[in-house]
Regions:
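Residue-level recognition of alpha-helical structural elements
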Residues: 68, 95-99, 125, 178-181, ...
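Amphipathic alpha-helix face/heptad-repeat signature
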Residues: 72-76, 102-103, 185-188, 192
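Terminal (often C-terminal) interaction modules
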Residues: 140-234
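Short acidic alpha-helical/loop segments enriched in Asp/Glu that coordinate divalent cations
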Residues: 98-102, 115-136
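Conserved NTP/Mg2+-binding pocket subregion across the NTase superfamily
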Residues: 1-94
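Short, hydrophobic, well-ordered secondary-structure elements
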Residues: 76-84, 88, 92-118
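Amphipathic alpha-helical interaction surfaces
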Residues: 109-120, 160, 198, 202
Length: 234
């Protein structure tokens, strides 16, 4: 659409909300996916004489920290489920399609986690998938980025995925098959998990050294101040 929007109409057309949900309404924040929040908060503002547009947009960047921690917990769970558990098992039984889908879920969860760790108010949100890696690369190159190496490692996983998932027994130089690619992917996944744990420890969000990330979730959720059940895992 071209033409003039009222400020509230503009944000409502993207998010369904004229202004950001209240800080005390975590269930409303959790209904907004990150790509939607990215669309509402990205882009250059050319003129805002009253400051109202910027104020409204900033409200959508100000995700309550309890919500951010709840999402971090969810992402840790998916990284563990897809990348550390289902992926190696799918590869071991030769189910290339299941392995490929596990990689997809792992990459998305890890990408989201990087943005959440870097805090939406500072880093913004993980955007729509076609801009995902462009945004990750840009964030990773910023001077004070947290987990700056994850983007490159995720791209390595994606480059290796075809050989690992569908290479077969006689694939590759010397007929070594898919085993070398599988070993590399599993190694990268565990390396990313270890980096995440180090960052969680640095931020005093965990005292555990456990690198299977599902077991880090209770430590993260201990820092959620609200008792709202939508913020806690079952």
């Amino acid at each position: 659409r071209d033409g003039v929007f009222r400020i509230g109409d503009f944000f409502e057309s993207i998010t369904g909300y004229r202004t950001a949900p209240a800080q005390t309404s975590p269930h409303e924040w959790l209904m907004l996916d990150e790509a939607t929040l990215a669309a509402a908060t990205n882009g250059e503002v050319f003129a805002d004489p009253t400051g109202q547009f910027s104020k409204t947009r900033q409200g959508f960047k100000d995700m309550p920290d309890d919500v951010r921690l709840a999402l971090i917990s969810k992402r840790l769970g998916m990284i563990a489920q897809a990348g550390q558990y289902n992926l190696p098992r799918s590869l071991k039984r030769g189910d290339g399609a299941a392995a490929w889908l596990s990689i997809h879920e792992f990459v998305n969860a890890a990408s989201s986690l990087v943005f959440l760790i870097n805090v939406p108010m500072v880093a913004g949100y993980l955007p729509y998938y076609k801009w995902q890696f462009a945004a990750l690369r840009k964030l990773s190159k910023s001077m004070f980025a947290l987990l700056p190496d994850v983007a490159e490692q995720l791209e390595s996983v994606m480059r290796l995925s075809s050989a690992a998932c569908y290479g077969g027994a006689g694939f590759g130089e010397g007929g070594k098959g898919s085993a070398p690619a599988i070993d590399q992917i599993n190694g990268i996944v565990e390396h990313i998990a270890a980096e995440i744990v180090k960052e969680l420890q640095r931020e005093h969000l965990t005292t555990s050294t456990e690198t299977f990330l599902e077991w880090q979730r209770p430590y993260i959720e201990d820092h959620i101040a609200s008792n709202d059940p939508v913020l806690k895992s079952l």
